[in-house]
């Protein structure tokens, strides 16, 4: 529906615009004072002069929703898959460190996020094959270590 960016973050017409702007700033999508006000921004598919967002920007909107609602638990499935490495790093830090009282389950093939987590479960063919912290799994030099090394070397 034709809604402002703030309303798309809150998923409601009864939006706390200041809180939505704070959540969008936290997600890295918006800067107060330098961007069009969030209550004026409308997605292009709904308005001729609206904005057309990239997949990465859409992922930041999803993170802004998580920041806006600050639920007790969040599931993030490939949440940063469309972001460049710098945006991904900032996104992951916000996701995992921005709300310390929030539990987060991260599902990802990109292992840069796993180093920030408390516990990692490696799954192969529907089964958990390894479990531990980032450092513990690297020290074991098992499947997680193999995947980490492959990504660290740039899939060379």
Q: Model-predicted segments: where are they?
A:
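Hydrophobic anchor residue at the start of the ABC signature
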Residues: 63, 91, 107
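Helical segment within the ABC ATPase nucleotide-binding domain
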Residues: 88-100, 112
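ABC-fold ATPase nucleotide-binding domain signature/coupling loops
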Residues: 30-61, 70-72, 154-155
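ABC ATPase nucleotide-binding domain helical subdomain, centered on the C-loop/LSGGQ "ABC signature"
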Residues: 6-48, 92-93, 101
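Conserved H-loop
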Residues: 101-108
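C-terminal portion of ABC ATPase nucleotide-binding domains
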Residues: 35-37, 93, 110, 115-156
């Amino acid at each position: 529906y034709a809604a402002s960016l703030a309303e798309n973050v809150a998923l409601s017409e009864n939006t706390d615009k200041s809180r939505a702007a704070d959540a969008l700033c936290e997600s890295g999508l918006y800067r107060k004072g330098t961007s069009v006000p969030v209550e004026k921004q409308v997605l292009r598919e709904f308005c001729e002069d609206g904005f057309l967002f990239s997949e990465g920007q859409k992922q930041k909107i999803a993170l802004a929703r998580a920041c806006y609602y600050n639920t007790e638990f969040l599931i993030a499935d490939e949440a940063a898959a469309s972001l460049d490495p710098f945006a991904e790093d900032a996104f992951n830090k916000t996701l995992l460190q921005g709300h310390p009282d929030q539990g987060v389950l991260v599902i990802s093939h990109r292992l840069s996020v796993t180093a920030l987590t408390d516990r990692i479960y490696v799954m192969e063919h529907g089964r958990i094959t390894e479990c531990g912290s980032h450092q513990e799994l690297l020290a074991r030099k098992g499947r997680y270590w193999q995947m980490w090394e492959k990504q660290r070397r740039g899939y060379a």
